[in-house]
Amino acid sequence: MGTRDWLTVSAAAIIMLSGSASAAQLDGVTLPDAVSLDGTELHLNGIALRTYSWLGIHIYVAGLYLEHPSHDAEAILDSPEKKLLAVRFVHNVDVANARQAWREGFEDNCRAPCHLAPSDVERFLAAMPSMRAGDHSTLAFTREGLKITMNGKTLATITDPMFSRAVLATFIGPKPPTPRLKRELLHNTK
C-alpha cells in the first residue's frame, strides 16, 4: 500500500471516528455515549456528580448505560435488559466510608419483600477497596447477575437478581445518596 492509500485510509478512519466518537463530560470526567456489554450496545442514559455534605465535596461521576434509555426508575430496576453503571472517582474514599455508604444504601433501598442474603452482602462489602481519585469502577447488570470491577479487575460476581436490583436501587431507588444524583442518572430535568 502506497503513501496515498495510507492517507486515504487514515482520512476515512478520522472521519468515521469523529462522526461516532461523542461523549458526555462532567467535572472533568468524560464518558462515552455508548459502551458494549457482552456484545450488546448500551447507551448513556444520564451522567451525574455525587457530592457529599453541605460543602458539596465532589466524590465521583457516574454514568448509567441502558439498552433503551428511560426516565422511569422502577421500569429500569424491573427490566431484565443489560445495564451498566460506570463510576469515575474524583476524590479519595477510604474503605470504611465506602462500606458504610453501601450498608446505608441497602438498608434504605431494600425494603420487604426485598431480602439480601447476608453472605452476598458480606462478599460484596469485603470486595470493596479504598478508592483513589482517578480510579474507575463498573457495575455490570445482566441476567446472570452483577459483576463489579475496579480499574479493569473483577472484584466480585453475585448471581442473585434481588441483589443486583438492590445495588442499582442505591443509585436510582427511593432513597439515593442525593436526589440530584438520581435525577441526573435518569436524565430527568424535573
Describe every region a protein language model picked out:
Residues 155-181:
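Flexible glycine-rich active-site/ligand-binding loops centered on an Asp-His dyad
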Residues 8-18:
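Bacterial N-terminal signal peptides
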Residues 180-190:
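Cysteine/selenocysteine-centered motifs that mediate thiol-based redox chemistry or coordinate metal-sulfur cofactors
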Residues 149-152:
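Short strand-turn-strand beta-turns centered on an Asx-Gly dipeptide
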Residues 67-143:
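Mid-length scaffold segments of soluble, non-membrane domains
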Residues 23-77, 112:
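N-terminal secretory signal peptides
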Residues 3-7:
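N-terminal export leaders
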